[in-house]
A protein has these predicted regions:
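Basic, glycine/lysine-rich polyanion-binding surfaces/domains
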Residues: 1-156
Length: 156
């Protein structure tokens, strides 16, 4: 199979966890409150991924995003967590990337109407995002080697 896996360089990664009572207020400041929304920057990189109810993953946040997070915390909407080291960022590409992932879940169906999702791929907790002809994945770091081994096995 033609599938390439590349572990991306470590970068700053934050999560924002909204207090249940504050989710409605986030809508007023233009945060998507529907899980599955993926905000992408002009260069195509992920900016804010709403991967589960009340939870957002923010890979390598720029100054503007950091300011938005600080404002959310200051307004009492939730907490910002530095989760550097929690996730291993992986890029899965090639004509058979979807087929490899389909051996664990129907990734096309999961991401059909959403920009991102919290899923379990090969029993590894993952935040998945479709990116044109490839997948950007944030695999729980303690599972990354197991994930890479599963992809390697299926890519042969």
């Amino acid at each position: 199979m033609a599938c390439r896996l590349a572990r991306l360089p470590e970068a700053s990664v934050w999560e924002f966890v909204a207090y249940p009572s504050a989710v409605r207020n986030l809508r007023a400041v233009a945060w998507s409150t529907a899980p599955g929304a993926a905000e992408i920057s002009a260069d195509g990189s992920p900016r804010r991924l709403h991967y589960a109810p009340g939870r957002w993953l923010l890979p390598d946040p720029d100054r503007d995003m950091q300011d938005q997070l600080d404002a959310g915390v200051a307004s009492g909407f939730g907490v910002r967590l530095d989760v550097e080291g929690k996730w291993a960022a992986i890029l899965l590409s090639g004509p058979d990337a979807r087929r490899v992932l389909a051996s664990t879940i129907d990734i096309a169906a999961v991401l059909a109407n959403r920009g991102c999702a919290a899923v379990s791929l090969f029993d590894c907790p993952t935040v998945a995002m479709r990116d044109v002809d490839r997948y950007r994945l944030w695999v729980a770091a303690s599972y990354a080697e197991s994930f890479e081994a599963a992809v390697d096995r299926l890519s042969r």
